């Protein structure tokens, strides 16, 4: 039944994703982070106090998320096993973001194909932290490909990894870790102190999933009739060409599969950031690379699901 729940949740994400205006745990986690952050900032003046307060915030948010998820699931199972199973499917479904990621990428791709540069810049600004107001088509394409490649890890592979390790409650706790990093894990002045623990713990949580993504995306590249060997080679060569210890693993693998370059200089919060280049520019990046990257994401996520199901069956002896 557990494996069936995994499969149904994955299929639901593939088909419908997160319908707009539906209640979603990540939104609740975000509200909790905002509430706790306000308290921490009020009572923790100075960088040292903010770092400690940020650590307490991380423990409170992640612990509360795991505890509530475990409690809701346990209560639902006591009401009725089938109700508990349905709640488990729903929880797992909410931790996966493949369809939402694909839709967000396609929202940028569509105006690009129609030569509506202004609209594509606006849509890209919804999914990246960089300044998009002056970006040209090649830079927009690169931003979308990087976003899909990076979020293949924290939107699909990592939730499945923690689902395998500790069930739906641990997958929900991972989403709290990831949401904390998304909201406060920045290096600029406002969040550097309060978000330090959140940023570092997100790096820890994604350490193994990011490295697993290198292998899965390399295999996916071969299955998609791209260069799987080049994906693995470039992915390994450029795996540390990023300020994050994890992001370049998936980005470099995708760059290698497509034969393009990612990374490079961008503006974040009014500051120019010169990132290392990732991959080799064997050709110019194009709008078609967005759909190719989405395809790689889906194949890699399918492989991840199959891998964790096989591992679960091997450990439990239950097919």
UniProtKB/Swiss-Prot annotation:
UniProt GO MF annotations: ABC-type vitamin B12 transporter activity; threonine-phosphate decarboxylase activity
Organism of this sequence: Salmonella paratyphi B (strain ATCC BAA-1250 / SPB7)
UniProt topology in membrane: Multi-pass membrane protein
Pfam families: CobD_Cbib
Transmembrane segments: 56-76, 82-102, 153-173, 204-224, 296-316
Function: Converts cobyric acid to cobinamide by the addition of aminopropanol on the F carboxylic group. However, the true cosubstrate could be (R)-1-amino-2-propanol O-2-phosphate, leading to cobinamide phosphate.
GO biological process, any: cobalamin biosynthetic process
Lineage: Bacteria, Pseudomonadati, Pseudomonadota, Gammaproteobacteria, Enterobacterales
Xref: NCBIfam families: cobal_cbiB
Subcellular location: Cell membrane
Full protein name: Cobalamin biosynthesis protein CbiB
Keyword Cell membrane on entry: yes
Any one cellular-component term (Gene Ontology): plasma membrane
Domain of life from the UniProt record: Bacteria
Pathway where this protein functions: Cofactor biosynthesis; adenosylcobalamin biosynthesis
């Amino acid at each position: 039944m557990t494996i069936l729940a995994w499969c149904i949740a994955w299929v639901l994400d593939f088909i419908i994703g997160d319908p707009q205006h539906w209640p979603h745990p990540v939104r609740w986690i975000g509200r909790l982070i905002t509430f706790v952050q306000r308290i921490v900032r009020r009572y923790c003046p100075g960088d040292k106090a903010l770092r400690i307060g940020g650590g307490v915030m991380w423990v409170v948010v992640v612990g509360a998320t795991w505890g509530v998820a475990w409690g809701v699931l346990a209560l639902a199972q006591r009401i009725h096993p089938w109700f508990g199973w349905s709640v488990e499917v729903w929880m797992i479904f909410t931790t996966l973001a493949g369809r939402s990621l694909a839709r967000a990428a396609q929202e940028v791709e569509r105006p690009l194909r129609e030569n509506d540069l202004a609209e594509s810049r606006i849509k890209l600004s919804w999914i990246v932290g960089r300044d998009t107001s002056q970006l040209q088509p090649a830079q927009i394409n690169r931003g979308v490909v990087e976003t899909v490649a990076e979020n293949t890890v924290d939107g699909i592979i990592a939730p499945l990894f923690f689902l395998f390790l500790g069930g739906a409650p641990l997958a929900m706790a991972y989403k709290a870790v990831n949401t904390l990093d998304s909201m406060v894990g920045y290096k600029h002045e406002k969040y550097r102190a309060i978000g330090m623990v959140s940023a570092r713990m997100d790096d820890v949580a994604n350490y193994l999933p990011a490295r697993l993504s290198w292998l899965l995306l390399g295999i996916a590249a071969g299955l998609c009739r791209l260069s799987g060997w080049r994906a693995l080679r470039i992915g390994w060569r450029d795996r540390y060409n990023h300020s994050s210890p994890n992001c370049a693993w998936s980005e470099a693998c995708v760059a290698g599969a497509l034969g393009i370059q990612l990374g490079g200089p961008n503006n974040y919060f009014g500051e120019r950031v010169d990132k290392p280049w990732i991959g080799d520019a064997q050709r110019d990046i194009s709008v078609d690379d967005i759909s190719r990257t989405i395809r790689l994401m889906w194949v890699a996520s399918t492989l991840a699901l199959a891998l964790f199901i096989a591992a679960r069956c091997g450990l439990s002896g239950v097919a």
